[in-house]
């Protein structure tokens, strides 16, 4: 079934503030929470609400959703969604709620890593090996936390559920809330003889090397999702995901604007006046560019297809060359003499006609 638009699910405008999104979720969650609404589709509607809120309440996820919708290319096909954590979202507003079985398989935590690359690596794409600290099941006790040859015992207070039930009177009526068992701290089991390697935690921290393929055309701040490269799951659950945020270092010549490249190209007075054919550096290599006579500072030339590749389509943007005319310093006497001679024989009227608007404004400024 095709997913509905998250803004439509919450009944808010696309430019809604964080506070408006929060209010909309609270109102609808009260209506469709399965503990309150006994209709057959209430549970599914509540999951849909919680999924929408989970994305739109997070600035980064909301920005990606606004740009790509449900199919975010940086997610490696995963897109947005998933029902994990919905109980936690409701608990954040209303307290209590239902708890997950502590012995049930749970997905490992997602991780984020920032990788810095050069401008040219962003142009061509690059493969990197990164080292990330992760938590994995202890190899000695295989995640049980118990000393080899022994086994964890089921908590007698909660019967292995990890929580105890407490009845409370609420605005919804009498509701049974589940709270964490204080004896086993939510694990459902008690380790009497802890593993010496992990000291009973069942997990150890280690460094893991991960190979990351960064696609050509990736822009600063974009991220890559590596499914299953996060932390190990709990109780045999799946691994979490790894999100690699790419930072692109600035280039000494080129500036990226979307998929285009902009650069300043210095020209001498003679080149700009008489015209010339010059070599222009691009990320694709050197390109010949004809400079017409009479080129002014601020003139811009376009080199089609010489920009960055689009990370999704592969289509290349353009390169824009901005002309900057360099005024010479430390002239020789002969050069000064020639410039004075040039100035004397120049047609000032012709220059004024070429820049009539500028000269007119200057005269008005002085004469009033």
Curated annotation (Swiss-Prot):
InterPro entries: DnaJ, DnaJ_C, DnaJ_domain, DnaJ_domain_CS, HSP40/DnaJ_pept-bd, HSP_DnaJ_Cys-rich_dom, HSP_DnaJ_Cys-rich_dom_sf, J_dom_sf. Gene3D superfamilies: 6.20.20.10, DnaJ domain, Urease metallochaperone UreE, N-terminal domain. It comes from the Bacteria. Its cofactor is Zn(2+). It holds the Pfam family DnaJ. This is Chaperone protein DnaJ. Its main location: cytoplasm. Binds 2 Zn(2+) ions per monomer. The lineage of its organism: Bacteria, Bacillati, Bacillota, Bacilli, Bacillales. It is found in: Cytoplasm. CXXCXGXG motif repeats lie at residues 138-145, 155-162, 181-188, 195-202. SMART domains: DnaJ. It comes from Exiguobacterium sibiricum (strain DSM 17290 / CCUG 55495 / CIP 109462 / JCM 13490 / 255-15). Zn(2+) 1 binds at residues 138, 141, 195, 198. Homodimer. A zinc finger (CR-type) spans 125-207. Coiled coil: none annotated.
């Amino acid at each position: 079934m095709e997913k509905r638009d998250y803004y439509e699910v919450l009944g808010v405008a696309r430019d809604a503030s964080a506070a408006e999104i929060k209010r909309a979720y609270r109102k609808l969650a009260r209506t469709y929470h399965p503990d309150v609404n006994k209709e057959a589709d209430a549970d599914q509607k509540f999951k849909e609400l919680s999924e929408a809120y989970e994305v739109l309440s997070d600035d980064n996820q909301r920005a990606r959703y606004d740009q790509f919708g449900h199919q975010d290319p940086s997610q490696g096909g995963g897109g947005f969604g998933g029902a994990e954590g919905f109980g936690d979202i409701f608990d954040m507003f209303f307290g209590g709620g239902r708890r997950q079985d502590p012995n049930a398989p749970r997905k490992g935590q997602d991780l984020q890593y920032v990788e810095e690359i050069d401008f040219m690596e962003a142009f061509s794409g690059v493969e990197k090996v990164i080292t990330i600290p992760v938590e994995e099941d202890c190899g000695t006790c295989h995640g049980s936390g118990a000393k080899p040859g022994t086994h964890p015992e089921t908590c007698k207070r909660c019967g292995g559920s990890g929580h105890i039930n407490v009845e409370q009177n609420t605005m919804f009526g009498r509701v049974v809330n589940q709270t964490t068992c204080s004896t086993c701290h939510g694990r459902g089991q008690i380790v009497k003889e802890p593993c010496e390697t992990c000291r009973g935690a069942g997990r150890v921290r280690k460094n893991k090397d991960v190979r990351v393929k960064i696609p050509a055309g990736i822009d600063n701040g974009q991220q890559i999702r590596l499914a299953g490269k996060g932390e190990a799951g709990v109780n045999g659950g799946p691994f979490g995901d790894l999100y690699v945020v790419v930072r692109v270092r600035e280039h000494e010549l080129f500036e990226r604007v979307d998929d285009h490249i902009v650069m300043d190209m210095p020209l001498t007075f003679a080149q700009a006046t008489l015209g010339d054919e010059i070599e222009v550096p691009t990320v694709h290599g050197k390109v010949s560019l004809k400079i017409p006579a009479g080129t002014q500072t601020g003139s811009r030339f376009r080199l089609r297809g010489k920009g960055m590749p689009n990370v999704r389509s592969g289509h290349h943007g353009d390169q824009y060359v901005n002309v900057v005319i360099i005024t010479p310093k430390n002239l020789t006497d002969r050069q000064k003499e020639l410039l004075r001679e040039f100035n004397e024989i120049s047609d000032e009227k012709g220059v004024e006609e070429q820049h009539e608007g500028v000269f007119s404004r200057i005269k008005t400024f002085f004469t009033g």
